[in-house]
């Protein structure tokens, strides 16, 4: 995860269907800000650009929402195609798909 640089947000985000859902909106913006800008190797697997390794627990700690709220937010984002999730035994790779 880069600590510098920027992301571009369009004002049309205001019309996004999840904009009024605080948890889902915060979760999506957090993922946008924390995904890899470049492909990186991590414990023998390649984490692609636009992806990050995390877990529901870790996201819950970072955002100060409950695990259930994080899980529901991820389900919303998966259902509408903004985020994809690949589960492994000890971690999950979240990918921003838009």
Model-based region annotation:
Residues 27-31:
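Short alpha-helical "packing" element that flanks the helix-turn-helix/winged-helix DNA-binding module
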Residues 21-25:
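Short helix-coil-helix linker/hinge
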Residues 18, 35-97:
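Winged helix-turn-helix DNA-binding recognition segment
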Residues 1-20:
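Long, low-complexity, charged/polar intrinsically disordered regions in eukaryotic proteins
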